[in-house]
C-alpha cells in the first residue's frame, strides 16, 4: 500500500508529454509512464481539476483515484476495469439467495472479526488496563440461527470491544471527549463530533477504498453481501470484508493518538463537525500504510497484510464458486510496535537512585523516561536497558 494524499486547494492533475503532472501552488510532482510509485491517489481537496487524459493515464497504470467528502468519508472512486466473471457473480447471487449458505459466510466473517478484535485487545493489555470480563462472556454466547441473531451477537461483542477502546482513547486524549461510535457495528458515521471519530471515519474511508479495489480485482459484485443487507446505492460486500480489517484502522488511530495530538490538529466546521487538518491526515495515512505493509507469515511464507487481504477475498471467491467446500478467513493478529509494557514501565518507576547506580543506568536517561511515564507518554526501551531492568 502506498497512497498519495492530495489535500487543500488549487490541485491540478494533467498529462504533459506523456508525463502525469500534479500541481498545487508552487509544488509540482511529475511522473514518467510506468514509473509512478503510488498505487492510489486520495483527494481531500476543495477546488481543483483533473483532465480526462490524466484519468486515462491513472487507469492504464492501475492507480485508483478516491475522492473524499468534506467530512473524510469516501465520496466516489475510480478503479481500473473490473475482472469480468459472470459465472462467479451468478454463484455469488446463489449463495446469497440460499439462507443456509448466506448465514455460513456471514458467520465466518463475524468469527474472524471477533478473533482480530480480541487479538488487538489482548495485545493492548500489555500496555493498557483491559477488562476482559464482559467481552469474554459475550464471545461464549455464540448462539445464532439467522442473520438477525448473528448481528445481535456481533453487536454485543462490539459494545464490549468499544468500551475497552474508549478507555484507551480517553487515557491518551482526554480533551477529545470520545464517547463511542454512534452505531457500534454497522454504521457509516458520516459527521464526526469529536477528533477520534474523525480519525476513525478517515481511516475507514481508506480501508473501504482498498477493499473495493481488491473485490474489483477478483470480480465479485460489491452490491451483494452476506452480513450487511442489500440497499440502494450501498456496497454490502465491501462493508462485509471491511469488517475483517477494521482492527488495523483502530490500531493506527491509537498509534497516532500516542503521538499526543492536540485539538489544533483538527478543524471545527461552521456546523460544529470535526475534520482532519492536512498534516494530521498525512500522519494517519502513513500509519495505515506502514501497518498494511508489515509482513506476516501466511501459508508458510511472508506476505504484507495488504496481500493477505487480497488472498482472503480470493478465498471467498473460491468458496462461492465451489472450488473449495469450506470457508475460513485467515488473518494474522496485529503486531504492536512498542516494548514499554505496563510491567516494564512499573519497573522503571520503581528505580530509586541507589538502584539506578546498581543497575548502571544513566541518570539523565532514567529521569527522562520516568518523566515521560508520569506524563502518560510512550517510551522506547533499548535492549541494553531492558536487560538491566528485567
PLM features: residue spans?
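Residues in the recognition helix of alpha-helical DNA-binding motifs
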Residues: 369-370
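Short hydrophobic alpha-helical runs that function as membrane-insertion/retention elements
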Residues: 41-44, 63-69
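Extracellular/luminal Protease-associated
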Residues: 35-49
Amino acid at each position: 500500500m502506498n497512497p498519495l494524499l492530495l489535500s487543500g486547494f488549487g490541485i491540478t492533475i494533467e498529462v504533459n508529454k506523456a508525463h502525469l503532472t500534479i500541481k498545487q501552488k508552487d509544488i509540482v510532482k511529475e511522473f514518467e509512464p510506468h514509473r509512478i510509485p503510488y498505487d492510489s491517489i486520495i483527494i481531500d481537496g476543495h477546488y481543483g481539476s483533473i483532465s480526462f487524459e490524466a484519468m486515462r493515464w491513472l487507469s492504464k497504470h492501475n492507480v485508483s483515484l478516491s475522492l473524499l467528502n468534506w467530512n473524510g468519508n469516501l465520496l466516489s472512486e475510480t478503479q481500473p476495469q473490473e475482472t469480468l466473471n459472470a459465472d462467479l457473480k451468478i454463484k455469488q447471487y446463489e449463495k446469497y439467495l440460499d439462507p443456509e449458505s448466506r448465514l455460513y459466510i456471514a458467520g465466518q466473517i463475524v468469527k474472524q472479526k471477533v478473533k482480530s478484535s480480541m487479538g488487538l485487545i489482548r495485545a493492548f493489555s500489555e500496555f493498557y488496563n483491559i477488562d476482559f470480563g464482559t467481552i469474554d462472556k459475550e464471545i461464549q454466547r455464540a448462539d445464532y440461527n439467522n442473520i438477525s441473531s448473528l448481528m445481535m451477537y456481533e453487536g454485543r461483542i462490539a459494545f464490549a470491544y468499544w468500551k475497552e477502546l474508549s478507555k484507551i482513547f480517553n487515557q491518551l486524549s482526554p480533551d477529545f471527549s470520545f464517547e463511542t461510535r454512534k452505531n457500534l457495528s454497522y454504521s457509516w458515521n458520516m459527521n464526526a463530533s469529536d477528533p477520534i471519530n474523525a480519525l476513525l471515519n478517515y481511516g475507514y474511508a481508506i480501508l473501504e477504498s482498498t477493499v473495493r479495489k481488491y473485490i474489483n480485482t477478483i470480480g465479485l459484485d460489491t452490491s451483494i453481501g452476506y452480513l450487511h443487507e442489500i440497499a440502494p446505492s450501498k456496497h454490502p460486500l465491501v462493508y462485509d470484508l471491511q469488517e475483517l480489517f477494521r482492527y488495523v484502522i483502530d490500531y493506527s488511530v491509537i498509534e497516532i493518538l500516542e503521538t499526543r495530538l492536540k485539538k489544533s490538529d483538527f478543524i471545527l466546521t461552521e456546523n460544529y463537525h470535526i475534520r482532519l487538518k492536512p498534516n494530521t491526515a498525512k500522519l494517519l495515512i502513513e500509519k495505515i500504510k506502514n501497518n498494511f505493509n508489515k509482513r506476516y507469515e501466511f501459508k508458510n511464507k511472508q506476505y504484507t497484510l495488504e496481500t493477505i487481504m487480497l488472498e482472503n477475498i480470493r478465498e471467498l471467491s473460491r468458496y462461492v464458486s465451489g472450488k473449495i467446500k469450506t470457508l475460513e478467513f485467515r488473518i494474522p493478529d496485529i503486531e504492536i510496535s512498542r516494548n514499554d509494557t505496563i510491567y516494564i514501565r512499573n519497573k522503571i518507576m520503581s528505580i530509586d537512585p541507589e538502584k539506578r547506580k546498581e543497575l548502571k543506568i544513566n541518570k539523565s536517561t532514567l529521569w527522562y523516561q520516568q518523566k515521560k511515564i508520569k506524563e502518560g507518554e510512550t517510551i522506547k526501551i533499548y535492549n541494553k536497558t531492558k536487560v538491566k531492568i528485567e
